[in-house]
Amino acid sequence: MTLQEQIMKALHVQPVIDLKAEIRKRVDFLKDYVKKTGAKGFVLGISGGQDSTLAGRLAQLAVEEIRNEGGNATFIAVRLPYKVQKDEDDAQLALQFIQADQSVAFDIASTVDAFSNQYENLLDESLTDFNKGNVKARIRMVTQYAIGGQKGLLVIGTDHAAEAVTGFFTKFGDGGADLLPLTGLTKRQGRALLQELGADERLYLKMPTADLLDEKPGQADETELGITYDQLDDYLEGKTVPADVAEKIEKRYTVSEHKRQVPASMFDDWWK
């Protein structure tokens, strides 16, 4: 088995999917897991990007079905901007599409800035823009877990195969969640599911960005990665990509393995 095939298997990628069946099994997963845990529903941060829009809509479909079947579940969508978000209109469009039971907004700027200032005062150095970006992601995680803890809700994560293969998420930030309904999907498959669900094309054709950096606001994921999502998707779907691209992907996969594992102990083999 080639490394490409091993990665496809490890990340549960299916090169060809049936859109309706894929939506059905992911909604069922959300329903089954929330029932199994005894939680009261879900909470998820909504950025206006493809991934949170898709996960949010699946979550809302799941809680509506649970209620229609006589159960009780709710979904809270959370806006978590740092000051004014450049693409706030897209975030509002996503909320209109998702139709969450409840939407709340929590500006993380005061929390992030207070921490950054305290860090600088105590350690006599400023956080790099990259590390401050990770603080933003982790404050968003803390906020979602605070809401989840208060309301008895599970935190949904938006990680999918094209992010997982590169480790393109913040450890214990957007990587911190209770369940991952998008696991195994490539970026183009996620787009196709949103299209099948009737989302405005603006929500799945827009340029993907983590938007964590003050110095490079709205920087494209592809710029930061040095790899396009089409190249990642082709690789994950078993297609041939240029050798240098495959090498980049496989190197990122190897060095980011710690992000896909629980914290290492002396009894684990994965890090050796």
UniProtKB/Swiss-Prot annotation:
Classification via Pfam families: NAD_synthase
UniProt-listed GO biological process terms: NAD biosynthetic process
Reaction(s) catalysed (UniProt annotation): deamido-NAD(+) + NH4(+) + ATP = AMP + diphosphate + NAD(+) + H(+)
Chain positions recorded as deamido-NAD(+) binding sites: R138, K171, D178, H258, K259
Binding site for ATP: G45, I46, S47, G48, G49, Q50, D51, S52, T158, K187, T209
This protein's UniProt keywords: ATP-binding, Ligase, Magnesium, Metal-binding, NAD, Nucleotide-binding
Binding site residues for Mg(2+): D51, E163
EC number: 6.3.1.5
One MF term in the entry's GO annotations: NAD+ synthase (glutamine-hydrolyzing) activity
Alphabetized SUPFAM superfamilies for the sequence: Adenine nucleotide alpha hydrolases-like
Metabolic or biological pathway, per its Swiss-Prot or TrEMBL entry: Cofactor biosynthesis; NAD(+) biosynthesis; NAD(+) from deamido-NAD(+) (ammonia route): step 1/1
Family the UniProt entry places it in: Belongs to the NAD synthetase family.
Quaternary structure, from the entry: Homodimer.
Function: Catalyzes the ATP-dependent amidation of deamido-NAD to form NAD. Uses ammonia as a nitrogen source.
The protein's name: NH(3)-dependent NAD(+) synthetase
Organism classification: Bacteria, Bacillati, Bacillota, Bacilli, Bacillales
Gene name, Swiss-Prot/TrEMBL: nadE
